[in-house]
Amino acid sequence: IITDHHTCKDRITTAAAAILNPKRPDCDYPFDALAGVGVAFKLILALAIKNGLKTTDVFNQYVDIATLGTIADVVPLLGENRVIVDKGLKILHNPKRIGIRAIMEVAGVLDKPLNASTIAFSIAPRLNAAGRLGSAATAVELLLTNDESRARELALLLDTENKERQQTERQIFDEALELIAKDPNFEKKKVIVLAQENWHQGVIGIVASRLCDMYYKPCILISHTNGVGKGSGRSIKGFNLFDALTHCEKQLIDFGGHAVAAGLNVNMSDIDSFIKEINKYADEVLTEQDMIPTVDIDCPLSERSVTLENAKLLSKLEPFGMNNEKPVFALAHAQVMNIAPVGADNKHLRLRIVKNNQTINCIGFGMGEFAEFIHQGDTVNIAFQMDINHYQGNETVQLILKDIKRK
């Protein structure tokens, strides 16, 4: 039995007894956005029904694992996915699995407020690190073990592998930027396609995502060995990557994925024609307006509404995630009190603003470069999400910056 959740081609040929995939053209299941783990979870529940087991007990036994996978797979947090994550987070607040407790402790989030974002940025990368750099066996053993000391050992190993993954990611990212700098036609291309020998397969997708965000262009990174390249791509709103690869299938060995993320195999002898064809397709599909990143603001907010009480009320709408994002607000005509880059490589931004004698603290992840052109005393408009900062037992309202515009 094969379980999958990737977009299928029209014809599926296999010797399998069954293929469970809500995206099959002949599947009429009403919710087709399940993560891979969600499809496997549904199979487990079906087997429970078949064998006369109490489905509530089986659901509660595995929903924590299904939650981790659903968040890590970055699928739309709607419908059944949202139900799975909502139920799973309640269990993960006090995890019963020894391995999950161990990885949460190593990540520094055990016994702290937990939401989908915590899983996405603190837990999922560590669990994924083993599979990205080699074998996923370490993560599997962690989730299965009943030995506390072994769980601690495995969690520390995954934490180390995650740091190695981050180092490899930085190296590939820097090499990708060098390739971009050497391309005289880069600005004319709507799709970034970069190829390098022996880039790490498990990391190129993350780097493609970073470049996609940085340049706001679809991006495909390809690692090649012995004349064959394996690629991973990420896309922007308005450009269906699976459709684009379908259009270019004559240049590819094979491919698969979704609208926003996909993988491919290509003979390097065909790479130039592939780059030409996918950019030709992008020229037909994407307008200049599509290439301009936007921040969708749900509503303007006055400084009087930026309170801890309102931040707590918003948190009751959790879980938030893809296609069900936390509301984005706008605050106009605030004055900058302090601004500074913070974190490793000054990658992030710490900002303090004031309006009508109310001081507000903000953090901008990946926005460190804003400190170069926004200064103390400037008047700014900001787009933000309201959050709660937990520090030494105290709670304060904190704004997560999405954009800043100087007046």
Name each region found by the language model:
Residues 6-11, 26-28, 226-229, 239:
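Short gly/pro/ser/thr-enriched loop/turn and capping motifs at secondary-structure boundaries
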